[in-house]
Amino acid sequence: MRVLTIFLLFMTSIFAVQIKDVANTVGVRDNQLIGYGLVVGLNGSGDGTSSKFTLQSISNLLQGMNIKVDPNDIKSKNTAAVMVTAKLPAFAKSGDKLDITVSSMGDAKSLQGGTLLLTALRGIDGEIYAIAQGSISTGGLTPRPGGAGSHSTAATVMGGANVEREIPQNFSQNNDLTLSLKVADFKTANDIERVLNTVFGEEVAKAIDSRTVKLKKPEDLSNVDFMARVLEQDIAYKPQSKVIIDERTGTVIAGVDVEVEPVLITHKDITIKIDPNNNAVANQNEIDMKDGGFVDPSSNTLRINNAKSTVANIARMLNKLGATPNDIIAIMENLKRAGAINADLEII
């Protein structure tokens, strides 16, 4: 079993980014949608008879087509009940396409190859904003032993829904324009205020706190013109390091310079020892990884004597041991809880 690990060189030095990369415009945001539907056409991998809600849903669907069937008489395993979720972007118009996520609710083994039937997607207000339907593909992943992160019971369908209802917006008439920083930071908020006031030659921005910058539009500009100019301005910025793990595909994305502090951690039968005082020579049964780390497959032990060990080193060594994505996720989460990783950890 192999885990796909990608190490990207994310520069941690200060560099220029546009304001739109570090801040959101308050009120301009996605809205969550959700719906309940059925996936049909599964080759015996759908919900069994223990999923009563699926049988009832099939019966209700057929009844709507003037076909009366008692739920207790339905024995098909080619159908699965699913929850469908999507994000409705700001300013989305009727007819726009949305990506959807389809997730099994019952005991289906796989959604691969099925078809999602017409599903209404509703907002928090209960109104229907989009309609979803389409073929399901889980990406061709095959299950791996040990819960290896292949989720054949969930899938993302690109462009699987059509927007049917728009969310009312009055952006052009809004006089209360505000930026909200994606990561709270007093220096970044102060830099945005300084840069914008300099560019426009008047006080158009005021940092309120570490996350909020209030804006005042010049009289000769429309809201759209003003925000277009605001969001394209460059500021000096130092990004927060991040480690991203895709639980479904087993992909790990990390900056090569995300360091891990000395720590001792045990997960199941895997032991990780990070200690600058470790023996710098490979012991019997150990494999020298040539980066200050040693792997002992016989005892599932990782030993690192490099004072500046990185997430990249550890993930590569765990791959060498054949660790599953679930194991890697659990280990990274425990390293984060122990304060050994100075980076944001995101599981997607």
From Swiss-Prot:
CC annotations in GO: bacterial-type flagellum basal body, distal rod, P ring; outer membrane-bounded periplasmic space
Q: Which domain of life is it from?
A: Bacteria
* GO BP, sorted A to Z: bacterial-type flagellum-dependent cell motility
State the Pfam families in the record. Answer: FlgI (PF02119)
Signal peptide segment: 1-16
Any single GO molecular-function term of the entry would be: structural molecule activity
Primary residence: periplasm
* Subcellular location as annotated: Periplasm; Bacterial flagellum basal body
Keyword list, A-Z: Bacterial flagellum, Periplasm, Signal
Q: What family is reported?
A: Belongs to the FlgI family.
Record's subunit section: The basal body constitutes a major portion of the flagellar organelle and consists of four rings (L,P,S, and M) mounted on a central rod.
Q: Which PANTHER family match?
A: FLAGELLAR P-RING PERIPLASMIC PROTEIN FLGI (PTHR30381), FLAGELLAR P-RING PROTEIN (PTHR30381:SF0)
- Function according to Swiss-Prot or TrEMBL: Assembles around the rod to form the L-ring and probably protects the motor/basal body from shearing forces during rotation.
What name appears for this protein in its UniProt entry?
Flagellar P-ring protein
Write down the species. Answer: Campylobacter jejuni subsp. jejuni serotype O:6 (strain 81116 / NCTC 11828)
